[in-house]
Amino acid sequence: MSVEKKPFGTLSDGREVSLYTITNEGGESISVTDYGASVTSILVHDRDGNLRDIALGCDNAADYECQTACLGGVPGRVANRIEKGEFTLDGTVYHLECNDGPNHLHGGSHGFHRRLWQASIASENSVRFTLFSPNGEDGYPGNVVVSVQYTWNFTKKGYFNDRDKSVLDIWYKGMSDRDTPLNLTNHTYFNLNGHDSGSVGGHLLKIVSDEFTENDANCLPTGRIVRLDEPEAKVMDFRTSKEIGRDWNEKNIHLQNGSGYDHNYVLLEEATYAAKAWTPESGILMVCTTEQPGLQLYAGNFLENSNIRGKGGV
């Protein structure tokens, strides 16, 4: 196990950005940067023993600063949308930036994924990022300190087979001196055939869930929890593995309201994992576990028109 730190370029204001690469005993690695506490690459072996980078990202800090897709970052203070950029807490109405049409998204245009975090090497296989957000920043109350730690392990015990596997553990911590909303996540885009391999429509996906949260036309939750055995929910059903792209062109109100798949699935409490994805091309299997009650399925619906310069110019 080892952690390597190297320069990752500079931001427009001249601040230097660093890249941290953790390599495990299986020769597989993950790279993370202090800009946005972002995952920039995940290198794992395919069925033929070749390394593939399965995380979308950019080559340097300048390209990350220009992109608006939250590639690999930690959005905050609140991931996802807040209607009309307003919320009420303890009788006070707070007004936030509306950076997604009429709504607030991922903490606004200065969200945590667009901030330079303080980094430290926590161990031989983990890196920790810490960020301070003062009271009133972007309209939110409370002085907040958040930490995110990435730990990269290797084990010979698999979930579904006896193959060796790498394990990425993401740990979050937030502290505030006042009540405030805080909802952190990681926004990595995965392609198990490789970041430069195009569509994930052929990936097989299973989600351990019987219900999902309904969206309105602005991709905001309506408050209705839809069961997957309802007739109009068939296209949303991943209880049995199916290709992600099998139904995504169907004329269905749920897909229209999300501009594709961009929905929260309510996870079964007794499940040992939340979701698994696999692609026959590479043979790479990804399993997701969580302590949280929901999982967001997002199929990169807005990437095509985002003008992002990805790794290697992709």
What are these regions (language model features)?
Residues M1-V314:
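An exposed, glycine/acidic-rich loop-and-rim segment of catalytic or binding clefts
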